[in-house]
Amino acid sequence: AEYFQHWGQGTLVTVSS
């Protein structure tokens, strides 16, 4: 399982696989 957190265009994107 991986956790990715990145800010872009004022939007928080979180991806968990």
UniProtKB/Swiss-Prot annotation:
The family database entries (SUPFAM superfamilies) matched by this protein are listed as: Immunoglobulin
- Entry keyword annotation includes Nucleus: no
Q: Which UniProt keywords apply?
A: Adaptive immunity, Cell membrane, Immunity, Immunoglobulin, Membrane, Secreted
GO-annotated biological processes: adaptive immune response
Q: Where in the cell is it found?
A: Secreted; Cell membrane
UniProt KW Ion transport keyword: no
Which interval of the chain is the signal sequence?
A: none
- Could you tell me the superkingdom of the organism this chain comes from? Eukaryota
GO cellular component, alphabetical, reads: extracellular region; immunoglobulin complex; plasma membrane
Q: What does this protein do?
A: J region of the variable domain of immunoglobulin heavy chains that participates in the antigen recognition. Immunoglobulins, also known as antibodies, are membrane-bound or secreted glycoproteins produced by B lymphocytes. In the recognition phase of humoral immunity, the membrane-bound immunoglobulins serve as receptors which, upon binding of a specific antigen, trigger the clonal expansion and differentiation of B lymphocytes into immunoglobulins-secreting plasma cells.
Under the subunit heading, UniProt states: Immunoglobulins are composed of two identical heavy chains and two identical light chains; disulfide-linked.
Q: What is this protein called?
A: Immunoglobulin heavy joining 1
Q: Which organism is it from?
A: Homo sapiens (Human)
**Organism taxonomic ancestry:** Eukaryota, Metazoa, Chordata, Craniata, Vertebrata
